Amino acid sequence: MRRLWLGGAALSATLGLLSPGPAEAWDRGDVHNFATIPTFAPSGPGAACPNEAKSCTSDVEGVTVAPDGTVYSASYGYNRDGALGGYGELFVFAPNGQLLTHFPVVGSSPHLIGLEYQQSSKSVLIADLGKGVVWKVDPKAQTTSMFMQAPTIIAGKSPGLNALTFDKSGNVYVSDSFQGVIWRTGPSGGTPTAWYAPTNPGQNDLLLPDPNKGEILSPPFGANGIEFNNGATALFALNTAYNSIVKIPVKTDGSAGTGVTFTTGLNGPDGLAVDANDNLWVAANQGDEIVVVDPNGRVVAKRAISTALPVTARSRACCFRRALSSARTRAGSTSPISRFICPLPACRRSRSIPAGPSRSSTTSP
């Protein structure tokens, strides 16, 4: 995401594999609840709440913010009691956290994940994990159209669209967690091209979630949060299953070079944002925290999820415009979005990230 945000309920990213250290070693800053996802009655084909309830709440996976400060988040289709059916739901909040409205994303699956506000169209682009589609939603008219649909290019796999970002020309990039691909399309959408893929010549499989022999990887998501550095010379992509950040060089013609592992040891990195100093803010869903990694791959700060939330809360998405974050709690009945107070705090120490599970990558000839 281009703006500074930290968000998502039912989110997945953590640093549980970091070497242990005393909790007081980090200034974790202030965290306040920003908003709470409301209960709603699902609509559309197969609409249902767990336990046959008439209405329910949902975890949320992503969060984005418009230039006027309006905050958007979409339902992920699960809560502590199970899965929801029907269309996904888009929630709209005022800059002060007040719920303005919510409505169904007609045509979608229940499982909406990453989303970005597209200023050129004044629309919200939403990745649909269940259908391999990016939806374009007009939040004023509450209408939905298909922006792009990803094809299957890896045998035995289906598209699993997850996170989105833009380049400086307005092109849209979408991570595919199941096929290990970064898709690209123009500002108006349409048929995407595989900007980065295991099948592209000179590229590799560092974004796939496939385990090495004898390994069990969980959660089984490959390419996840994606973001360019400020100079647009590299795109960083998180591999949740491998606890890693992959750095993909951007060539002068805008094409992708060969990705390399930038750092590893993050326990389920999920959401990603890049600040003005090229620090990477990673939502860590197994450690219930936001971890800040500097341009050299060192952890320089941590932001904790609100202590008011149970330890089962999960942090998934990141977005930097307002220093907000969202978190899901499986132990409770609500899905809060939390506000993280910036600027980046000074830390008592920094440390390198130890290695996590390694991948023997294969580069396409």
Positions of the model-derived regions?
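Bacterial N-terminal signal peptides
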Residues: 8-18
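Residue position within the beta-strands of beta-propeller blades
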Residues: 71-74, 126-127, 174, 237, ...
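Blade-level signature of beta-propeller repeat domains, shared across WD40, Kelch, NHL, RCC1
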Residues: 325-365
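Beta-propeller fold detector
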Residues: 30-39, 100-105, 145-151, 192-206, ...
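Short loop/turn segments that connect beta-strands within beta-propeller blades
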Residues: 93-98, 138-142, 186-190, 249-254, ...
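Beta-rich, blade/repeat-based domains predominating
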Residues: 43-47, 52-68, 85-87, 106-124, ...
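Sec/Tat signal peptide C-region and signal peptidase I cleavage site
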Residues: 20-25
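Short glycine/acidic-enriched loop and turn motifs that connect beta-strands
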Residues: 77-82, 131-133, 179-181, 242-244, ...
